[in-house]
Amino acid sequence: MWIKELELKHYRNYDHLLASFSSGLNVFIGNNAQGKTNFLEAIYFLSLTRSHRTRADKELIHFDHSTVSLTGKIQRISGTVDLEINLSDKGRVTKINALKQAKLSDYIGTMMVVLFAPEDLQLVKGAPSLRRKFIDIDLGQIKPVYLSELSHYNHVLKQRNSYLKSAQQIDAAFLAVLDEQLAGYGARVMEHRIDFINALEKEANTHHQAISNGLESLSLSYQSSVVFDKKTNIYQQFLHQLEKNHQKDFFRKNTSVGPHRDDLAFYINGMNANFASQGQHRSLILSLKMAEVSLMKALTGDNPILLLDDVMSELDNTRQTKLLETVIKENVQTFITTTSLDHLSQLPEGIRIFHVTKGTVQVDSDIH
């Protein structure tokens, strides 16, 4: 899939913008604080209905206005699709082909994106919540049912935690009802995650071995807070641990086990990647991003759109070459932001260059 056209109204520092793109590489050049990242954020927002930079939707609205409108014309294998998001103080409205979508799980996945931003370099050593978010964003685009089950899980989790905080003593019968619901949704969330990580590991290891010239292997491990011996037993063992932890959870006023506390670990040649060098970290993250692209295509039959936000300068020539070779080979529409073309070691034919200045975008040229 690829974005043919994007229109922004009152988004960040863009009062109004209408732009069309190449189905291949699109490079956005400009000084800092001109709107390059805002532009990629808009594509991300149109795909996932959320920003990767802020939780406050009001920050997305141009200072002179009270509403935001994003529309995009997306070319999929199945045909052209029009996406639209309208944002105001009353909330957000999402539409596909002018039809309002009642649930996020009906909207997300229509346009898949993979974002590679400087903050992704913290994925390995950062907080576990970053790694859970990484899994949830990918799985939500690949499997709409996952978003629905995760939403149900979070709703029951909120109910359970609220009860634990307010209760004067344990009502075992009431907790048992919540435990069964939480274990049911949670087990399915974990099953989806485990299958996804196993598939992602194979793709990521293939890319990592290519980047390291066969010297390094990359493995991933889903770290569950629920102890289980095999995937088919997750529900029963999750439920058992919830029941076992009633007193502990009551004392702590929260739920101590479940997918909301799970993590993801990375290993290079069998060694925890927390102890890897900076160069190895960059190779690992690059391998993951390329694996996201190839796995989404393998599981859905369509390519995602790749957003590279000021990361090319973080990669040496070898890693840049591997990345560009992959997107060209896989025919992935790619958006790159940079302050200078000097940060790109080589540019293939058929790219479109845009100059970004104070919320305006001007097409420079197509290189053939």
UniProtKB/Swiss-Prot annotation:
Its main location: cytoplasm. ATP binds at G30, N31, N32, A33, Q34, G35, K36, T37. GO terms for cellular component: cytoplasm. InterPro entries: DNA-binding_RecF (IPR001238), DNA-binding_RecF_CS (IPR018078), P-loop_NTPase (IPR027417), RecF/RecN/SMC_N (IPR003395), RecF_2 (IPR042174). Keywords: ATP-binding, Cytoplasm, DNA damage, DNA repair, DNA replication, DNA-binding, Nucleotide-binding, SOS response. The keyword Cell division does not apply. GO terms for molecular function: ATP binding; single-stranded DNA binding. Transmembrane segments: none annotated. One of its GO terms (biological process) is double-strand break repair. It is found in: Cytoplasm. The RecF protein is involved in DNA metabolism; it is required for DNA replication and normal SOS inducibility. RecF binds preferentially to single-stranded, linear DNA. It also seems to bind ATP. Belongs to the RecF family. This is DNA replication and repair protein RecF. It comes from Streptococcus pyogenes serotype M2 (strain MGAS10270). The gene is recF.
